[in-house]
């Protein structure tokens, strides 16, 4: 899926992928990041505290390098009670307990992501 998506993106396209909780399921989270990297995406992992889910992970991905510092465009600067340039950039500052861990690339022939999900989320029973 990600390979086909990458082939169809044009120009400076950027996608955001909702991954999972990098705190509860670090291998699952980093497996998704690594899978995006494996098909040629440049990635910027990030996280946010979501009230109904807790610490949640996402990743920005693009065929082109992503800037180290992001700025809200004027089109996105409508009324916001939360998001500022400073807060936006802090989302990409992963604390040590969310640091990258070893994980395999998810493929159709290994479905390792399913194993990671079962192992990590199943341990919460």
PLM region spans:
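Acceptor-substrate binding/catalytic loop of class I
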Residues: 19-28
């Amino acid at each position: 899926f990600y390979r086909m998506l990458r082939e169809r993106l044009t120009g400076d396209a950027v996608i955001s992928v909702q991954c999972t909780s990098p705190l509860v399921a670090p291998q699952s989270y980093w497996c998704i990041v690594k899978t995006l990297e494996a098909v040629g995406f440049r990635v910027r992992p990030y996280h946010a505290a979501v009230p109904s889910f807790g610490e949640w992970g996402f990743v920005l991905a693009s065929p082109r390098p992503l800037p180290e510092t992001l700025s809200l465009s004027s089109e996105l600067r409508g009324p916001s009670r939360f998001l500022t340039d400073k807060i936006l950039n802090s989302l990409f500052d992963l604390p040590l307990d969310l640091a990258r861990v070893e994980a395999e690339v998810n493929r159709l022939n290994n479905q390792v992501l399913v194993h990671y999900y079962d192992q990590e989320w199943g341990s919460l029973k």
